[in-house]
C-alpha cells in the first residue's frame, strides 16, 4: 500500500511523554500496521503533510525497504521503524535533528548495510538494531559505535567508554572485512527471521491481540520496546 495524503490526514495523532517524562509534550503520528511500501513518487511529498511540529513518527510493522524520506523535517526527534524490510541506511532521509532511531527486527545482516551511519545526524544518540542478524556479528557493538560515535545508547544499553576505545580508530573507521556470505549462514539468517514469525504465530489469538492493544496504548519508548521484544519472541525483563 502506498502512503497517500489521505493516509496522513486520517492517521491517529496524540500527545505523549515518550522522551521528556512530561505530559502533552511530544506529538506522535501513528502509521503502524498499514502495509506501507517504499516508493519515491508520492511518499516524499506526502510526508511533508505531517502535522506541524510532529515529534515522533511510528512506522512500525509495515513493508518499507528504504527509510522514509524525512530529510526535510526538523521537528521529528524519534523515528520508529521496527518490523519492516529495511536493509540499507541512507542517512540523507533521516530527520535533521533525529535523536532516537528504532530499526529493530529488519534485514540488516552485514556491516556494509550500516555505512550510512557515518552521515547520520550528530544529534542521534539512541539506536536500536535488536532482532537483526547483524547483532550476532563479531565486534558488532564496537563497529556500530565507530560508525556513529555520537551514540549514547545502543540496543537499550548505554555505550561504555571501553567500547569506544575498542572501536576502530583509523581515519576510515574500517569495519571487519566480510566476504561472500556462506550458504549455511544465509540459511541461518533466513531461519532466524522465520523463527520470529513462528513465535508470533504460535501465540493464541487473544494473547496476540492483547499485546497489540497494549502496544497501541504504550506511552513510553521503554514500554514500546518491551512489547515489541515480546512479539519478536524475546524475553521480557
Curated annotation (Swiss-Prot):
LRR repeats lie at residues 53-74, 75-95, 97-118. Gene3D superfamilies: Ribonuclease Inhibitor. InterPro entries: LRR_dom_sf, RU2A. Residues 161-182 are annotated as: Disordered. Residues 132-170 form the LRRCT domain. GO terms for biological process: mRNA splicing, via spliceosome. GO terms for molecular function: U2 snRNA binding. GO terms for cellular component: Prp19 complex; U2 snRNP; U2-type prespliceosome. Keywords: Leucine-rich repeat, mRNA processing, mRNA splicing, Nucleus, Repeat, Spliceosome. It is found in: Nucleus. Associated with the spliceosome. Involved in pre-mRNA splicing. Belongs to the U2 small nuclear ribonucleoprotein A family. This is U2 small nuclear ribonucleoprotein A'. It comes from Eremothecium gossypii (strain ATCC 10895 / CBS 109.51 / FGSC 9923 / NRRL Y-1056) (Yeast).
